[in-house]
């Protein structure tokens, strides 16, 4: 769009390629000529003129609950930054901030010794967010998820994983974005029947570097919440539904912390950051006893509440507890808007607790009809020693016997991370290995197998297996 070409990020932070692409698109929804149209082929009227990507009637008609982030930005720009006032541009996005200003210039001692209307956060009114940063979660192949769920199938304990993938355009929502998951990495964890305890992940930076060399990055997390229905048919209990909860209060706060940790870089905010594209996916039981993934994010307001340390988990999984004002933490009045039994919008006092649902944003999820996954996934998965699934020299040797003597045997994320951890290949050779998988060029594969580090690896394998 015209404004997008003028406004570019002023900081060193880089927008994702998908955002750069969608910034340039208008996203107008074309409509066919109808019988009500009274004009020629080249004419246009109110019945067939294109609709803006935020048009509520169109979204409702197609069952789209939330407008996309870029449609939301374009709607705000339409309202605030018309072509007539191009010189007085106003950034359409501003992250909510619920913290008290401890460096207030109002001439009083810093809070808690002094306070004024300037440094005091305004009362908060929570309502369900009308847009979402990511519209869809797609696993590149069903095998990725099946292998992840296998831990529960074999042992009955729950599992947690980090989703590595990329963001792409999602055509079913105007200006939509989907997260495409190519691999699930399982960091160190103590798995139990009713949950997971995460342990220190010392090689996280190395895993991130391997992913980056493949054109991938963290797009979210996934965890299981599965209980066998004891019917002998593989069915599971449906524990998450409209009468219980979808994400528990602890999980919603975890999602908010993750989103704060991985902010979304955008030219449309004065701070160059707004909310996050980080997704939280839970694998749980559906209404028919089937195993199904459900994807969520939490709202920008949820992120702000966590940043301000205003909320905590409660004893009820479907309720978020609001903390008391204490020390340097000032908690303003908090309300939430809901529709009552008469169809009217009313405000309720959110203290001492309010429903988690007011912070949730629901995503769609699916598998592609014609999967073309990046990885073949044959190598043992990390942190599964308790199942007898070991990553060792024998596993590397077995992996290298696969394929047709070409680079296809290298196409496994868990294998690539393990080889990088072995510290046998040099930095340049690791880069060559990752490029070989990413681009699939024969000359890169030839250069790799002829490299000194690769020959050393093969020699070590010959003497170890």
Describe the residue ranges of each PLM region.
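N-terminal beta-strand/alpha-helix entry module and adjacent surface
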Residues: 1-219, 224-322, 393, 413-419, ...
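Eukaryote-biased recognition of electropositive, low-complexity segments
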Residues: 274-424
């Amino acid at each position: 769009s015209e404004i997008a070409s003028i406004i570019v990020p002023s900081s060193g932070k880089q927008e994702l390629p998908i955002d750069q692409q969608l910034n340039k698109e208008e996203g107008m929804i074309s409509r066919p000529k109808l019988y009500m149209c009274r004009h020629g082929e080249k004419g246009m009227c109110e019945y067939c003129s294109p609709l803006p990507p935020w048009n509520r009637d169109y979204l409702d008609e197609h069952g789209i609950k939330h407008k996309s982030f870029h449609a939301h930005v374009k709607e705000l720009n339409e309202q605030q930054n018309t072509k007539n006032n191009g010189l007085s541009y106003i950034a359409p996005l501003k992250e909510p901030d619920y913290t008290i200003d401890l460096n207030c210039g109002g001439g009083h001692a810093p809070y808690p010794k002094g306070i004024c209307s300037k440094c005091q956060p305004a009362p908060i009114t929570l309502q369900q967010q009308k847009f979402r940063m990511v519209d869809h979660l797609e696993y590149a192949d069903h095998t990725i998820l099946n292998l992840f769920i296998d831990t529960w199938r074999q042992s009955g304990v729950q599992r947690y994983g980090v989703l590595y993938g990329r963001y792409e355009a999602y055509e079913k929502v105007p200006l939509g974005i989907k997260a495409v998951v190519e691999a699930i990495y399982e960091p160190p964890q103590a798995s139990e029947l009713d949950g997971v305890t995460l342990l220190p992940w010392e090689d996280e930076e190395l895993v991130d570097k391997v992913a980056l060399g493949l054109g991938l990055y963290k797009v979210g997390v996934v965890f299981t919440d599965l209980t066998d229905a004891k019917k002998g048919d593989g069915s599971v209990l449906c524990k998450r539904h409209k009468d219980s909860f979808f994400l528990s209060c602890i999980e919603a706060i975890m999602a908010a912390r993750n989103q704060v940790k991985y902010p979304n870089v955008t030219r449309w905010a004065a701070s160059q950051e707004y909310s996050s594209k980080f997704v939280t996916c839970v694998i749980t039981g559906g209404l028919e006893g089937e195993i199904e993934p459900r994807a969520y994010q939490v709202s920008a307001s949820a992120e702000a509440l966590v940043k301000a340390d205003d909320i905590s988990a409660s004893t009820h999984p479907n309720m978020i507890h609001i903390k008391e004002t204490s020390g340097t933490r000032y908690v303003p009045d908090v309300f939430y808007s809901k529709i009552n039994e008469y169809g009217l919008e009313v405000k309720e006092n959110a203290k001492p607790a309010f429903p988690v649902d007011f912070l949730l944003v629901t995503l769609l999820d699916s598998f592609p009809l014609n999967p073309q996954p990046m990885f073949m996934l044959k190598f043992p998965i990390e942190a599964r020693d308790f199942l007898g699934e070991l990553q060792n020299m024998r596993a590397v040797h077995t992996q290298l016997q696969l394929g047709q003597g070409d680079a296809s045997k290298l196409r496994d994320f868990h294998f690539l991370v393990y080889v990088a951890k072995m510290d046998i290949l040099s930095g340049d050779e690791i880069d060559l290995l990752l490029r070989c998988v990413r681009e699939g060029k024969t000359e890169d594969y030839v250069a790799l197998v002829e490299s000194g580090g690769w020959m050393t690896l093969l020699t070590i394998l010959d003497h170890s297996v």
